[in-house]
């Protein structure tokens, strides 16, 4: 009897040498929390409709696509660099570190990695940087969604621990409300103390 593989099984029969991964990050600009990166290898046999730059999608749509990407992609990995690593390395190097971790965490090794932006992490395979890649390459769009949703969920969790800052609302960005909370309450352990607005609050708090 001839065994016909399922779509998922058939996908895994592809030549690994032809696999392409998309990589993007979330959380470079905020004043608090880790920077998150995701790497995704999509399955051409299971297309995902509606992939786009995560920034133009509603939160509800991102959540829907997050689950679909996780279910349909050949493989994906979400990684991060901590606040401590951001402080030690700087935000650019920490972002590249998170990207490298995401690629290295993929179950399948891609032949080519397409990265959103104009800088590349150090990788063992060929890689290309694509400016505005999250709007141009489906795999990068998928990575941007995974990274964004993962970080937004982190913000919701830390908001419970530090409700006075409103992380669930502003996602750590330097909004008027966030800066006011920083001035009133000072910085919490999740704040990036080398970032200008946070450093300024800490300086003003010195006796």
UniProtKB/Swiss-Prot annotation:
Coiled coil: none
Signal peptide positions on this chain: none
The protein's enzyme class: hydrolase
Compartments reported by the entry: Cytoplasm
Biological process terms in GO annotation: DNA replication, removal of RNA primer; mismatch repair
UniProt entry tagged with the keyword NAD: no
Chain positions recorded as a divalent metal cation binding sites: 24-25, 116
Main location: cytoplasm
Cofactor detail note: Manganese or magnesium. Binds 1 divalent metal ion per monomer in the absence of substrate. May bind a second metal ion after substrate binding.
Cofactor(s) the protein requires to work: Mn(2+); Mg(2+)
Enzyme Commission number(s): 3.1.26.4
GO MF: manganese ion binding; RNA binding; RNA-DNA hybrid ribonuclease activity
Domain RNase H type-2: 18-207
Annotated keywords: Cytoplasm, Endonuclease, Hydrolase, Manganese, Metal-binding, Nuclease
One GO cellular component term: cytoplasm
Record's function text: Endonuclease that specifically degrades the RNA of RNA-DNA hybrids.
Family: Belongs to the RNase HII family.
NCBIfam families in the record: PRK00015.1-1 (NF000594), PRK00015.1-3 (NF000595), PRK00015.1-4 (NF000596)
Protein name as annotated: Ribonuclease HII
Provenance organism: Albidiferax ferrireducens (strain ATCC BAA-621 / DSM 15236 / T118)
GN (gene name): rnhB
């Amino acid at each position: 009897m001839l065994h016909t593989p399922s779509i998922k099984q058939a996908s895994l029969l592809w030549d690994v040498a032809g696999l392409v991964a998309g990589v993007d990050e979330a959380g470079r600009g905020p004043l608090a929390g880790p920077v998150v990166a995701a790497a995704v290898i999509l399955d051409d046999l299971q297309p995902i409709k509606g992939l786009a730059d995560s920034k133009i999608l509603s939160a509800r749509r991102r959540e829907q696509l997050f689950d679909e990407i996780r279910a349909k992609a050949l493989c994906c990995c979400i990684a991060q660099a901590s606040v401590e690593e951001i402080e030690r390395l700087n935000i650019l190097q920490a972002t590249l570190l998170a990207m490298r971790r995401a690629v290295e965490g993929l179950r399948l090794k891609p032949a080519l990695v397409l990265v959103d932006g104009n800088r590349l992490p150090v990788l063992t395979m060929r890689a290309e940087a694509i400016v505005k890649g999250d709007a141009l390459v489906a795999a990068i769009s998928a990575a941007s969604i995974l990274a964004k949703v993962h970080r937004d969920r982190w913000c919701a969790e830390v908001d419970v621990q530090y409700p006075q800052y409103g992380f669930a609302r502003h996602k750590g960005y330097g909004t008027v409300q966030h800066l006011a909370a920083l001035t009133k309450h000072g910085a919490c352990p999740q704040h990036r103390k080398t970032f200008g607005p946070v450093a300024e609050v800490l300086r003003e708090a010195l006796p």
